């Protein structure tokens, strides 16, 4: 059965130019699923939520994580609080738009949905 999802937020990927996007650019496309991780050690933003791309190296089987950037500071407080409360599994984050010709802050847009908690 397909999980029910509720639209929560659409935003740009902040800080993209400072992180690992270029290493995996060719693997990213509209619909790519990303992971949201609370970054408690971020000295620039007390509510920092990292956006991470995970892939498995086909040769070694090792899971590799690439920090792509962050949820913008003006958009992250509720997500940060829910992640701190252990609700990381309720979020589905996917790339909704890629524009390589745009300014860094506008190259990647994200759609975040809340996945309904289906009880057995």
Can you annotate each of these PLM segments?
Residues 1-120:
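Conserved active-site motif detector
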């Amino acid at each position: 059965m397909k999980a029910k999802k509720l639209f929560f937020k659409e935003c740009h990927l902040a800080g993209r130019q400072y992180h690992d996007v270029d290493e995996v650019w060719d693997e990213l496309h509209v619909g790519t699923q990303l992971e949201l991780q609370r970054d408690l050690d971020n000295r620039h933003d007390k509510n920092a939520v990292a956006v991470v791309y995970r892939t498995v190296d086909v040769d070694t089987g090792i899971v590799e994580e690439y920090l792509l950037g962050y949820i913008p500071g003006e958009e992250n407080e509720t997500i940060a609080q829910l992640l701190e409360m252990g609700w990381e599994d309720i979020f589905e984050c996917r790339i909704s738009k890629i524009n390589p010709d745009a300014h860094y802050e506008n190259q990647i847009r994200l759609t975040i949905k809340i996945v309904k908690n289906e009880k057995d």
